[in-house]
Design a protein with these regions (language model features):
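Bacterial N-terminal signal peptides that target proteins for export
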Residues: 2-19
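C-terminal motif of bacterial Sec signal peptides marking the signal peptidase cleavage site
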Residues: 26-28
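Sec-dependent N-terminal signal peptides
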Residues: 20-24
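Bacterial signal peptide processing site
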Residues: 30-33
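Signature of soluble extracytoplasmic/periplasmic domains of secreted precursors
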Residues: 62-904, 910-920, 924-1021
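Low-complexity, Pro/Thr/Ser/Glu-rich flexible segments characteristic
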Residues: 35-66
Length: 1021
């Protein structure tokens, strides 16, 4: 039925369409310098000498039209959404036990049949107590652990139990106040039962993913509260059956499975299950990586048709061949990007990824490098630095990686003064920063570092090149590249090919080459990174133990001795599995030779992997086979070119080759080799796909449509070279979202009836269009469709010419007045309008939308056209008017996306607030403790860390708690990251093409070419 369709969460499903622009805006930067006018990259098919983007034939974006008269933008249902109140419960205090802590067990009998489940409970006046709930049939047991024993036995307790259930069609919370009285009997088993119930709650909440701490605590709580006993045999058996710690193949997928693996590892550590991988007696040389070949890049260069000289990347001569590389022509561009990233790009990307923690990587790496962003650097940096490159040896920036800057110095005096100023600032903030020197290859490397590794600047000078790194090994590798002692990126054939394929100068250029990818997926780095992940879990354990101590005792621990005495930390956990010692002081990050819990030592600075275990070898080989299934034959480079001019940022990305089994291959199945030129639009959002003549999808759709209808005419043989889907920028978009969304507003008391849903959908300004290559075929198909509809539902559907616009007839297909009652009630709500105009057929839900599309398609310069070369194969473009329907819909979508990660963020906040109650009134201490124990800080959708704890759980002042949420008007404030984005983003255009490369390889090599153009407003001062 229409009313029970999955439309309720439709806004969440379409968010990626709205939100892709946020991630792409990473490279936009305010008011950048004008790029040089050299040739732009070639697009489309075999590389051509004439630079042309995929959209090159498109006319410039027309000025935005005057918006039509519309109704008001929909209003969100704002305010607090309190739990529904249940009848009060009366129960008994059945058991208790006193000792180092007080335990009480309460029991309540519930009315049967309401379908609600008890989830959370709180006891009045017991803020420091831990309370666990078990719901069994018609009984609820509430168990409390009071960390500080009272002198008198409690014979009366009051509080609240919160239930999950349904009210009408809405899931919601219910609050049941309770009182429990009686004289309890002592029960020595009460701590064990409490540990079992709390362990289950810590691992399996229904309000979002739990943190790794919760998994550790779920395992360790048994030993901490069960008189030193281990977890029940059934729990241990279940954990051993999973064998997560020894399933090293999962650890090889370090970039995709880190969080879930960390949680599983911590649960096993909490249970005391120590995974072993055996003796390291297998030579790394015997572990084979993926059998992937290099492209014949030199021969491919010879096949290029361009006569334009290749671009130059002089700083690539200072970078090792197996490092990633980013170059900026002007330091001001880089500084603008960093400022934009701090203001809104990183927070919005964080929301899109649904990550619960903000790691503040920019601040971390600035501190490690001894660098900073001052007003003087932004104003005068270009006089000190001609250009700069940033490079590194691996992609593990979140965990901890090497980052090296190579500055081409224009004024040594200004440059030295600026770096000295920044280093002095860090020496003031970080105690113990000392100076040292090492000599490498005749060069002096000056090191400034503190004992904890928070600052570790390595600096060297070679001619006019200044090298600044956070890694000694990386600094040495860069010096070796400069001196020619190691292969340099500038000499690599893949980079030389990319620079020759698309010559021209650009404001910024980024490159990932064959050798970098080969190192990342090779056995040395993969096995080393897997060991780092295990070491990171071991470094996190003391901090988690300190938090668990606070949960159980109502205060933070004073020493590690308290942790071991309380049973929350095993002395052996102050060492890694490889024997390396772990130093830990409660309140600070644990540290060892592997680094700190909040920032691991760069992988390149660790001892090289020479021997591995048989388990590590087998795990890597399993990973290698899976990797090779995607990259069938070759590993290839990725090049990114960035140009900034005025308020527009252009990002051009080329990836070689297409990856088997991915969404890109799915798109290629649709488009084939067909291309389309798509003129710019000035209103709304649309996506245009080229449709290849002989693609498998076209043939399959044609076969299915004729087979389904039984009519030969009802196929898609009339379909031309492109199809389009889109929407105009109208307030009706907000009407539909306001009806269905329950992420950014209070839910409706009752789900709307079907006519109301149909009416909202029928007002949407959406459209579909398709190129027509056979008018006769289209007429036959429409006639066949009309006959079929009358056969299926006689007299229920009407087809009528309702009007003309620009002399183009418009047809309305709707529900007839003579239709049955169950259908006729939708007659005034839903209809489809269509017209054939400009060689295309257009379908809409509103006549006014169709008229706009007729205006657009009547102008041949504004409609897509097929192309043999140039153009693109997929184009997406969107424009938003400030405060308009699309703008508001995007705002709501961003806010809803930001709130998806809040359940997990609240769990992290709960871990800190219960682990050290003193941080509730000290925001700086909250952030510091979160960084020390988690390596990041949980933040609200507004980027704040102002969480608090109350009986119904963790809350923030704007959005409330999970049990008692609040829904503020949007935007929440002008200084939030989402508001900053909405003030900046004006339009986005993305194009995708699959281009042939000049190679004799079989099958023929095709690259993925993507181009983004973003238009941004002025940055706030």
């Amino acid at each position: 039925m229409l009313g029970r369709m999955s439309l309720r969460h439709a806004p969440r499903r379409v968010r990626p369409l709205f939100l892709g622009s946020a991630a792409l805006a990473l490279l936009a930067c305010g008011s950048p310098a004008t790029p040089e006018a050299a040739g732009k990259p070639a697009e489309g098919g075999t590389p051509a000498p004439t630079p042309a983007g995929p959209d090159a034939p498109a006319a410039p974006t027309p000025s935005a039209p005057t918006p039509p008269a519309e109704g008001p933008t929909a209003t969100l249902r704002t305010g607090s959404f309190a739990p529904a109140t249940m009848d009060a419960l009366t129960g008994s205090i059945v058991h208790n036990l006193s000792g180092d802590a007080d335990y009480y067990e309460l029991e309540f009998t519930l009315p049967s049949g309401d379908g609600r489940t008890a989830v959370v409970a709180a006891i009045d006046g017991e803020a420091a107590a831990l309370v666990a709930v078990r719901h069994e049939a018609d009984r609820v047991r509430v168990t409390m652990r009071r960390p500080i024993p009272s002198k008198a036995l409690s014979t009366s307790l009051a509080g609240t139990v919160w239930f999950r259930g349904y009210e009408g069609q809405n899931q919601r919370w219910f609050a049941a106040p309770f009182t429990a009285t009686g004289t309890p009997t002592k029960d020595a088993e009460l701590p064990r039962r409490f540990a079992e119930v709390l362990s289950n709650q810590l691992r399996s909440g229904d309000d979002g993913p739990r943190s790794p701490f919760h998994h550790f605590a779920a395992g360790r709580i048994h030993a901490a509260l069960g008189s030193g006993a281990a977890a029940p045999a059934t729990v241990l058996a279940e954990a051993r059956a999973r064998e997560t710690s020894t399933d090293l193949s999962q650890l090889m997928y370090t970039t995709t499975a880190a969080t879930s693996l960390h949680e599983a590892l911590q649960y096993e550590k909490g249970l005391g299950l120590a995974g072993t991988t055996g003796k390291r007696d297998v030579a790394i040389e015997t572990v084979a990586g993926p059998a992937l070949a290099d492209h014949p890049f030199e021969a491919m260069r010879g096949g290029l048709s361009t006569t334009t000289p290749p671009s130059e990347e002089p700083l690539a001569a200072a970078v090792p061949a197996d490092f990633w590389y980013v170059r900026f022509s002007d330091i001001r561009d880089m500084l603008r990007i960093l400022d934009e990233a701090s203001t809104w790009i990183t927070p919005v990307a964080h929301a899109m990824e649904e990550r619960p923690l903000v790691r503040d990587l920019a601040e971390r790496y600035q501190r490690e490098l001894g660098l900073g962003r001052s007003g003087l650097a932004k104003a005068l940096g270009h006089t000190a630095v001609s250009r700069l490159a940033i490079t590194g040896s691996d992609p593990y920036l979140r965990d901890g990686s090497d980052v090296t800057f190579v500055f081409e110095v224009a004024s040594q005096v200004v440059f030295d003064a600026e770096l000295t100023k920044h280093l002095t600032r860090w020496q003031t903030e970080i105690p113990g920063v000392a100076r040292a020197e090492v000599i490498h290859g005749g060069h002096t490397i000056t090191i400034h570092a503190d004992p904890l590794g928070q600052v570790r600047q390595h600096r060297a000078q070679v001619g006019n090149l200044a090298v600044v790194s956070n890694s000694e090994a990386a600094c040495k590798r860069v010096l070796d590249a400069i001196d020619g002692r190691t292969p340099k990126l500038a000499d690599e054939p893949d980079l030389r090919y990319m620079l020759a394929r698309e010559p021209g100068t650009h404001d910024a250029f980024a490159f990932i080459g064959d050798k970098f990818v080969a190192q990342v997926v090779g056995p040395k780095q993969k096995i080393q990174q897997a060991r780092r992940m295990q070491a990171a879990a071991e470094l996190a354990t003391p901090g988690y133990a300190a938090l668990l101590y606070g949960w159980l005792h109502g205060r933070a621990p004073a020493s590690t001795a308290e942790l071991t005495a309380a049973g929350v930390l095993v002395p052996a956990e102050l060492a890694h599995s490889d024997g390396a010692a772990i130093e830990f002081t409660p309140g600070a990050p644990a540290r060892s030779s592997w680094g700190r819990a909040d920032a691991l030592r760069p992988r390149i600075d660790l001892p090289e992997v020479t021997k591995v275990t048989a388990a590590e070898r087998d795990a890597y080989e399993q990973f290698s086979r899976g990797y090779q299934d995607y990259w069938r034959q070759f590993i290839d480079p990725i090049a990114v070119r960035i140009d900034l001019e005025g308020d527009t940022a252009s990002i051009d990305v080329r990836v070689l080759p297409l990856i088997e089994g991915t969404n890109y291959r799915d798109v290629e199945d649709i488009v084939g080799k067909q291309r389309v030129v798509v003129p710019a639009i000035d209103d709304g959002l649309h996506a245009v796909w080229a449709v290849g003549k002989d693609t498998r999808l076209r043939k399959e759709l044609d076969r299915m449509s004729t087979a389904f209808s039984g009519k030969a005419d009802l196929g898609i043989g009339w379909l031309g070279e492109w199809v389009m889907l889109g929407t105009l920028d109208r307030t009706a978009l907000t009407d539909a979202i306001a009806l269905f969304d329950d992420d950014v507003q209070k839910p409706l008391p009752e789900w709307p009836d079907e006519p109301a849903i149909a009416k909202a959908l029928g007002k949407l300004p959406v459209f579909a269009a398709a190129d027509v290559n056979s008018t006769a075929g289209l007429v036959a198909a429409l006639a066949a469709l009309r006959v079929m509809s009358n056969e299926v539902a006689p007299g229920a559907i009407t087809w009528e010419n309702v009007a003309t616009h620009r002399d183009v007839p418009m047809v309305r297909v709707g529900i007839a007045p003579t239709a049955g009652d169950d259908v006729r009630r939708f007659a005034d709500s839903v209809a489809v309008y269509y017209a054939q105009v400009g060689g295309a057929i257009v379908f809409t839900l509103q006549q006014s939308t169709l008229e706009v599309l007729i205006d657009r398609f009547s102008d041949e310069t504004r409609r897509p056209t097929a192309a043999d070369t140039g153009g693109a194969q997929l184009v997406v473009e969107g424009h938003v008017r400030p405060q308009g329907g699309g703008w508001t819909a995007l705002l709501w979508a961003l806010q809803g996306q930001a709130q998806i990660g809040q359940p997990a963020a609240r769990h992290y906040a709960e871990a800190i607030l219960r682990g050290d109650p003193s941080v509730a009134t000290d925001a700086a201490r909250f952030r510091a403790l979160s960084l020390a124990y988690f390596g990041g800080v949980p933040v609200t959708p507004e980027g704040r860390a102002d969480y608090g704890l109350r009986p119904d759980g963790v809350f923030d002042p704007i959005h409330g708690s999970a049990i008692h949420p609040a829904f503020p008007p949007l935007p929440v404030a002008d200084d939030t990251p989402i508001a900053a984005l909405m003030m900046r983003l004006s339009s986005l255009r993305a194009s995708v093409s699959f281009d042939d490369e000049p190679t004799s390889a079989t099958p023929a090599t095709r690259s993925l070419h993507t181009r983004f153009e973003l238009t941004l407003g002025a940055a706030a001062e």
